[in-house]
């Protein structure tokens, strides 16, 4: 049986062998707290490549030490990180997958020691620290950090870069009126709140000509926050700037109760794809091959991003192929167990 899920997808000359993407998920495994790749990463990611995932996106990787979510996050703020990342990328590609990396800055949600920064001096919650409002110099320095991170990702041999603009981290904090109360050109109007992300995209594009994704939170789940309709013009602008795909998640810019169910974020990806005319990735409680195939067949997204399901089962593509009545190849070492 021919399937969409196991059909190839090409972006800017990079061909992903199927539409299955391992979503970036923090592993909090840098036990040396220096941001460097550890043995855990060198086992965790290649295992999913052996399992026939088409694209693996490495977890949120901090472009600045102060921009880590935790002290155990991966980093790309120094040239010293490149060798470990290069080895990781090579291991994944050795097993037939493409590899991406998510460039991130946690902003006010950083839990590292010392000063934290954000567009405005507003804490995430009553239980978290109040960040310092970023100066123009802070903004320029952070944009440069994203560009430097992209340059290092290129040196390390990554196929795809994703900019993390979701989940209440720094870029998302600029986009949302709930966290951005600035009175200058980086706050106020939707255009001004987009400016920080727009300048990051331009800076990354100066050093990176490969596929570029941006992850967004398409709903703030708050009456005064952003909705998917607000993100349509943002997505159009991203496309004009050379972004190739929007990875559509939601929430986490402020504390909120979110009603989750299988595929609960898929309608957001569908709306962005249809109304902004840009490729999208759907993510959020996608757990079966039939569910993934439906999303693709009905034009709701171009790629499916799996997170927790790939933690539970690194060989999910095999199970999905069996469910859909098709066959996929296995690594030679595993062929005895993968016969359909």
Curated annotation (Swiss-Prot):
Its EC number is 1.6.99.1. GO terms for molecular function: FMN binding; NADP binding; NADPH dehydrogenase activity. The keyword Transcription regulation does not apply. Its cofactor is FMN. It comes from the Bacteria. It catalyses: A + NADPH + H(+) = AH2 + NADP(+). Gene3D superfamilies: Aldolase class I. FMN binds at residues 23-26, 60, 102, 215, 307-308. InterPro entries: Aldolase_TIM, NADPH_DH_bac, OxRdtase_FMN_N, YqjM-like. GO terms for biological process: response to toxic substance. Substrate binds at residues 28, 164-167. Keywords: Detoxification, Flavoprotein, FMN, NADP, Oxidoreductase. Catalyzes the reduction of the double bond of an array of alpha,beta-unsaturated aldehydes and ketones. It also reduces the nitro group of nitroester and nitroaromatic compounds. It could have a role in detoxification processes. Belongs to the NADH:flavin oxidoreductase/NADH oxidase family. NamA subfamily. Homotetramer. NCBIfam families: PRK13523.1. PANTHER family: NADPH DEHYDROGENASE C23G7.10C-RELATED. This is NADPH dehydrogenase. It comes from Geobacillus sp. (strain WCH70). The lineage of its organism: Bacteria, Bacillati, Bacillota, Bacilli, Bacillales. The gene is namA.
